[in-house]
Amino acid sequence: MRERLSQFIGTDSYKIGIFTYHGFANEIINNYREYFLDKDLDSLADDLNIFKILESLKNNLDDSSRLKKDNISSLTTAISHAKQALITPEMLAKIAKQNVELDKKLLKKLDEEEIDFSVLEEKGISKKTVFPEFYENLLITLAEVLKDVTPAHPKVNPNLFYTFEALEKLLEENKNAEKFSTKPFTSFRNDFFGIKNEKGRLPKDFYTNLKIQEFADFYKKYEEALHSKGMFDYNDMILETIKTIEQKTELKLSLQEKYQFILLDEYQDTNAAQSRLVELLTDNEIFNGRPNILAVGDDDQAIMAFQGAKSSNMLDFYHRYKDTEVINLRINYRSRSEILYSAKNIAEQIESRLNENLPTRIDKDIEAFDDSKFESPYLVRKDFLSQISEFGWIADEISNLIKSGISPKEIAVLAPKHNPLQMLAPYLKRQEIAVSYEKKENIFEDEIISSLIKISQLIIAISDNNLDKINALFPEILSFNFWKLNPVEIWKLSWKINSKRETVNSWLPESLFC
């Protein structure tokens, strides 16, 4: 970026601050250290430290915990997303608690009013009459449950709000439909009341919110453990900067005076925490709601949810400032018309696009600058009955391209996540197609590394004469695939030693000859 800028303004480009959001937060911390003396911001926790803290917390969970089966990576991601959304453990607990309480209130009311989904499955009913009538009663009940409810968080409505909105829309569409169909009603039921037990149907998010309540406590303990070690994680860099600017008026005014012209690139990738940092730099009354700020972004790209980003952040930006001007960029310099046409067909399927929520509708029909600059593309869309068919077809296509003389280096397979690429790999290998696969690995999730960590923990437990930990670790370690031991024999050995509660030394001869 700086090199490109220097082509326009020369050496003055080195006087301009060009940062990532984390880099900007770090710049503030380093340049205004006197405002951060009470913060533990000298020791950034690396992946190993974070892994150890989370592993310790997870190991201390009860066996009945809903978090017990989650891997460390998913817990790390969940905490990161919460921080990026500016949601503290306390806030998260309140949100989940409110959802659970409202779900219970709804279930009680449905029971009292004898509103039961099973009536929809009775034989001989007039579905055209019964289905709408049932769901209209459900809508009335939802309205009663939600009456006078204040959201636990100002920007997070209870889940039943969205259930109510979806059902209201469904009933309205049914009234206007030329032909009655039960499919939309069944889809609604599965989407919002998809859990079935002996008492009937439950809101689909019921158990999820119970799990979130547990996670909020886990998240809180993680924060406490991190701070007790005098550490902070990557997301804390922005969060602590936000807190300090909010609390220290002098710092806020200094930053607002220094950074009077702000350009935000790829704004669709901005999360709530990053947006709040920008807001603090631009909310001075002297700006009269019109600071010198320019945001460049494409809300259609926000569907990838990069680092907690949401397209609503762009809409918030529009409403935050006075008389915000929208500059519509309709010329594309990178693609031919065929590509843009296909992209448009996909983008039009996105619900709640930015242009539909702005007071002035903007034209999102993108035009190619010059088709002659690119070769004509070959686009094909395929539907498959199974992933096996899909992966087989991709491998065959790549093999045929290579046989036709196309260099393998000119071929790429793109996917939104790593899992489908990993599943595709055996099909390419079967065709003897060499691949270059790049992935940012979490070494602690590697099976071999995880096994070595467990074995190391066992050695320490033996050294410490910790019988409980040995009893817990030994069966798991003996079950590792590379030992190739009979699972039945491992179970027998585990049962024998646990039942006798023998000494540490008795494990070794027993296990060596199992």
Residue ranges and their predicted role:
Residues 1, 17, 45-50, 101, ...:
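Conserved helicase NTPase motor core
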Residues 1-3, 91, 95, 250, ...:
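Conserved motor-region signature of P-loop NTPase helicases/translocases
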Residues 1-11, 412, 419-428, 498-505, ...:
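Gly/lys/ser-thr-rich phosphate-binding loops in alpha/beta enzymes
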Residues 2-101, 109-111, 115, 312-316:
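Conserved P-loop NTPase-based nucleic-acid remodeling module centered on helicase motor cores
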Residues 53-60, 78, 218-222, 240, ...:
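A general alpha-helix detector
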Residues 60-210:
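"flanking P-loop NTPase cores in genome-maintenance ATPases
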Residues 78-84, 88-91, 206, 290, ...:
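Polyanion-engaging groove/track-forming segments
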Residues 209-213, 466-467, 514:
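Accessory C-terminal helicase-associated subdomains
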